């Protein structure tokens, strides 16, 4: 019965049995073949002149255009891994690296808020400048008016002072007090100048009753060239 099915035909004929296939090696070979097929589809194949890897036979579900892909609305779409899968991977990576929508909205709101704050600060600065300029002009105007009023009041006070009785005596007393104050100040080299202030050097003065021209000339010379000690 076994002979009828031919199970032991190879052993009886003396031919060596085929070695058992390694599952790990077969899996690695299949993966390398698939990777090579993807690279060839995306344009990353070997350069011209090199031997391309043999294409893996696909499932034979039909003949003609059915082996190449699926036709939808007159367009043929590739069912195997091709450029569409590569673009999808890139789009997925972009979605992963893209900022979340909440953070993007927060950044946009912060940018608009900073722009509004900058514009408001510029407007406020301009208003402060105009206000400061106006205040300075008003202060200068008030100061000028106050100075003019002080001048007028001083003139009126001086006129009233000299019109009051005994104004000469009051003025003489004030001059005497100023002279005493200056005389108490000890400044080297001004002694004869202080002495000359006590004399009347007007030759037409009616108060003089004696000839003091000689003494006057001596005092003038001492005032101009004091004696050296």
Swiss-Prot record:
The keyword Zinc-finger does not apply. GO terms for molecular function: clathrin heavy chain binding; peptide binding; structural molecule activity. Transmembrane segments: none annotated. One of its GO terms (biological process) is intracellular protein transport. The modification Phosphothreonine is found at residue 187. It is a peripheral membrane protein. Signal peptide: none annotated. It comes from the Eukaryota. Disulfide bonds join 199-209. Residues 93-155 are annotated as: Involved in binding clathrin heavy chain. Residues 1-17 have a biased composition (Low complexity). Keywords: Acetylation, Calcium, Coated pit, Cytoplasmic vesicle, Disulfide bond, Membrane, Phosphoprotein. It holds the Pfam family Clathrin_lg_ch. The modification N6-acetyllysine is found at residue 204. The keyword Disulfide bond applies. Its main location: membrane. The modification Phosphoserine is found at residues 11, 13, 217. Belongs to the clathrin light chain family. Clathrin is the major protein of the polyhedral coat of coated pits and vesicles. This is Clathrin light chain B. It comes from Homo sapiens.
């Amino acid at each position: 019965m076994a002979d009828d099915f031919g199970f032991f035909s190879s052993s009886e004929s003396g031919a060596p049995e085929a070695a058992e296939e390694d599952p790990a090696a077969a899996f690695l070979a299949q993966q390398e073949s698939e990777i090579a097929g993807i690279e060839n589809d995306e344009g990353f194949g070997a350069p011209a002149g090199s031997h391309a890897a043999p294409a893996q036979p696909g499932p034979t579900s039909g003949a003609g255009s059915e082996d190449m892909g699926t036709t939808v609305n007159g367009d043929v779409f590739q069912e195997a891994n091709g450029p569409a899968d590569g673009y999808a991977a890139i789009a997925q990576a972009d979605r992963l690296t893209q900022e979340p929508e909440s953070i993007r909205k927060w950044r946009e709101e912060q940018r608009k808020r900073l722009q509004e704050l900058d514009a408001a600060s510029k407007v406020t600065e301009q208003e402060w400048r105009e206000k400061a300029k106006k205040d300075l002009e008003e202060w200068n105007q008030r100061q000028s008016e106050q100075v003019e009023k002080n001048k007028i009041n001083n003139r009126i006070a001086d006129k009233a002072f000299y019109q009051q009785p005994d104004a000469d005596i009051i003025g003489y007393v004030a001059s005497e007090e100023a002279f005493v104050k200056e005389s108490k100040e000890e400044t080297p080299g001004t002694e004869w100048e202080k002495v000359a202030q006590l004399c009347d050097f007007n030759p037409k003065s009616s108060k003089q009753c004696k000839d003091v021209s000689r003494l006057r000339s001596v005092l003038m010379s001492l005032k101009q060239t004091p004696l050296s000690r």
